[in-house]
């Protein structure tokens, strides 16, 4: 998108902060003074805008997105091209099968990126506190809340992956033991509950100004997610808020509080379900009223940065599509033919009455015809790839030559273990191997629009981390789990009817088509909600946590080893490089930071 948040580094202010916030009292950065600079709200905006820099690494395959997507049932990354592409020393095989260890690349990168993001937030909070008197009370409170809430999101990502983390609210080295999951959860909830009521409430007048920034909707959505997953994080009503004051808003069960937070978002009137599902993933999607928090993208090469292996650009469509898509669409960046769906995952789109198929049938699209329903978020009913008349959420079928609807792209420059060079490219659902797959194996996620003009190297589509649709489904699930309220309080909303109708937009009566395919939501079970969340939020970084919440994470396709099924696998191991740098306890002579129990002998 063209509209950008100010991420510019306020170099002068941060230079003054140095390695310790105490240096701020000792340095005078010429004329004007720091006090003068902090009295100008534009400078405060520039300073605070830096907190969003690290979140731009979230959706990379070597970052948080890759870690949580390839370990859930929705995603897979397999070596192709004779094992020459996407091998990476067996890294993806370990992720696919839940046999990872503490030296995994993305495991290390996620730790470093999120910790650095949280530390920067603490540094900026320190500056705001030191120069509080230079700002009006309103300006100080507004930006302090914005930074504290964003810090909570960085720590949430870290917490979601590792459980035990070095949570701190001060700009200083963390010297104590890692906090236990229930204590981290309590701190996150307390911070968000404190700030949420005072955050900006989005409306049409201020939507553009608050786009890509933390808002009240952001805070309550993250709170709802924390409450919904509290038990999955190991929290009970008896072990939370032991070391931090319980928020006055907290009352009843975790699910009661999830409902309350969802209602705060719903009743704000800030957000609206888009009538077109694919508009949320369009090239220019910044006007989506469904977006609660987004990573603001710039598909051009400026502002391009690498954090070790991780890039701050959206590349998901390029990671998944076959090599031939680059030539068909004329994209600037190569398409890398890596990520795909686990075949069994796509059964959530199975048509009613569809015949039972064998795993061999996954490799024959003619046998797959009629297997999937008309839900546009799925593979669809055509299975003709680039010759499809409609847009479908998962790509299955042929890859045509550019400018042709009949001639197929030929795999001339790559090696396939069973298909000779020059084989016509037809993508199928099946995956033949986790160590040396066919180039055509696996359905590819197709919902993010790709630039077909040769203008943008990377995705110009903004990445919506939180969507309003998630809030509606979280409330329904929380109610089914015993939270206050009724399912009908959601299903009678006009936005909810729009949500289910758009999934079957190609049908004459979309809302009825949804009910015919999946039943009446008012009669759904929790398993029905899980399936729908898979359909709605594929590859949007929610599925792993959903599966953990449902106690199904370690029973997905390709996870078969006894070690992979251990309960500890709901967390990733703390990176080896982190433990190596741990401070030493002077009394015991042992490292203060220790590995998560169950991973000690990696």
Where are these regions (language model features)?
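Bacterial Sec-dependent N-terminal signal peptides
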Residues: 5, 15-42, 188, 224, ...
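Conserved, well-structured interaction surfaces
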Residues: 40-59, 63, 83-162, 172-186, ...
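Short coil/turn linking the two alpha-helices of tandem helical-hairpin repeats
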Residues: 157-160, 166, 203, 229-238, ...
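Long, intrinsically disordered, low-complexity segments
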Residues: 20-21, 114-117, 280-341, 455-465, ...
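An aromatic- and glycine-enriched ligand-binding surface/loop that stacks and positions planar moieties
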Residues: 22-91, 193-194, 213-417, 555-557
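C-terminal substrate/ligand-recognition segments
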Residues: 104, 108, 365-499
């Amino acid at each position: 998108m063209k509209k950008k948040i100010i991420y510019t580094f306020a170099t002068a202010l941060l230079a003054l902060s140095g390695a310790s916030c105490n240096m701020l009292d000792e340095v005078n950065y010429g004329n004007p003074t720091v006090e003068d600079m902090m009295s100008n709200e534009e400078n405060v905006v520039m300073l605070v805008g830096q907190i969003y820099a690290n979140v731009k690494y979230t959706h990379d395959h070597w970052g948080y997105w890759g870690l949580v997507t390839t370990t859930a049932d929705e995603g897979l990354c397999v070596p192709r091209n004779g094992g020459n592409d996407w091998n990476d020393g067996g890294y993806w095989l370990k992720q696919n099968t839940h046999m990872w260890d503490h030296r995994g690349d993305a495991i290390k990168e996620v730790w470093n990126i999120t910790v650095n993001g949280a530390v920067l937030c603490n540094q900026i909070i320190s500056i705001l506190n030191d120069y509080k008197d230079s700002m009006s009370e309103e300006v100080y409170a507004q930006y302090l809340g914005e930074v504290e809430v964003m810090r909570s999101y960085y720590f949430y990502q870290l917490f979601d992956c590792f459980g035990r983390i070095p949570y701190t609210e001060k700009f200083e080295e963390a010297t104590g033991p890692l906090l236990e999951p229930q204590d981290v959860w309590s701190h996150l909830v307390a911070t968000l509950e404190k700030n949420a009521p005072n955050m900006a409430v989005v409306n049409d007048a201020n939507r553009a100004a608050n786009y890509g920034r933390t808002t009240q909707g952001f805070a309550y959505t993250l709170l709802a997610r924390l409450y919904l997953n509290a038990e999955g994080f190991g929290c009970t009503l008896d072990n939370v808020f032991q070391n931090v004051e319980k928020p006055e808003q907290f009352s009843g069960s975790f699910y009661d509080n999830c409902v309350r937070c969802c209602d705060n978002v719903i009743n704000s009137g800030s957000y609206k379900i888009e009538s077109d599902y694919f508009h949320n993933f369009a090239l220019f999607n910044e006007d989506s009223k469904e977006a609660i928090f987004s990573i603001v993208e710039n598909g051009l090469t400026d502002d391009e940065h690498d954090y070790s292996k991780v890039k701050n650009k959206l590349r998901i469509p390029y990671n998944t599509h076959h090599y031939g898509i680059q030539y068909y669409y004329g994209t600037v960046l190569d398409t890398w033919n890596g990520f795909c769906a686990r075949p069994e995952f796509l059964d959530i789109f199975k048509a009613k009455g569809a015949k039972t198929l064998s795993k061999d049938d996954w490799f024959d699209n003619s046998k797959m015809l009629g297997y999937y329903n008309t839900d546009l978020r799925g593979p669809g009913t055509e299975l003709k790839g680039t010759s499809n008349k409609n847009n479908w959420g998962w790509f299955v079928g042929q890859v045509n030559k550019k400018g042709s609807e009949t001639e197929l792209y030929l795999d001339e420059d790559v090696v396939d273990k069973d298909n000779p060079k020059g084989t016509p490219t037809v993508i199928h659902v099946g995956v033949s191997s986790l160590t040396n797959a066919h180039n055509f194996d696996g359905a590819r996620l197709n919902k993010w629009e790709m630039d077909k003009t040769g203008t943008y190297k990377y995705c110009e589509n903004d990445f919506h981390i939180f969507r309003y649709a998630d809030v509606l489904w979280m409330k329904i699930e929380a109610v089914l789990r015993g939270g206050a309220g009724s399912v009908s309080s959601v299903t009678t909303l006009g936005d909810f009817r729009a949500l289910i109708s758009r999934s079957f937009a190609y049908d004459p009566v979309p809302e009825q088509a949804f009910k015919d395919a999946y039943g009446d939501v008012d009669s759904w079970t929790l398993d029905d909600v899980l399936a729908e969340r898979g359909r709605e939020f594929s590859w949007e970084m929610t599925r792993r946590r959903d599966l953990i919440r449902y106690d199904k994470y370690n029973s997905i396709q390709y996870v078969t080893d006894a070690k992979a099924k251990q309960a500890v696998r709901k967390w990733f191991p703390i990176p080896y490089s982190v433990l190596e740098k741990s401070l030493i306890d002077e009394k015991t002579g042992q490292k203060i930071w220790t590995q998560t129990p169950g991973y000690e002998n990696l």
